[in-house]
Amino acid sequence: MTESHPDTFCIILLPVPLDRHCNPFFPADLTNHDHACELARLSLAAWRANPERWPEVHERLFSRPVLPPEVAEAAVGQIVGYDELARALEDPWINQILQTGIKDFKQMIFRSGAMPKLVVGDDEVLHGAHRSKEVLLETLERLYRLRD
């Protein structure tokens, strides 16, 4: 959609750790994602240190099994540079972005606990994964009246 309608769509990733250690709004009946708080901080620090390398960091942090924080930090440092990562981890921007994402999550979780969330326009939120890429594209085309 961003390629076929660049003036209509953009993608903004909103980091929200699914872990009550740093996200008090994550539902108590769901299992925390191991190390989500630490990995979210590392991801944001990697973006801050070297945004061009962030996709590689993202893939590494979402690999299985989940990396313990110390191993993840070493892996991210290898990708973006150890000194750059250390400096970025000290940046207050990281906590500001996390708190913004958590605050937005608080508002969205009341409607449905299904993940992921896709915010469309000013007030439409799609909850949960779509059955297929085609179904998602059809939904967006319908919402934005993109069909001829």
Feature locations, PLM:
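Structural alpha/beta surface segment adjacent to cysteine/selenocysteine redox centers
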Residues: 1-74, 146
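C-terminal cap of thioredoxin/glutaredoxin-like
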Residues: 1-5, 9, 73-148
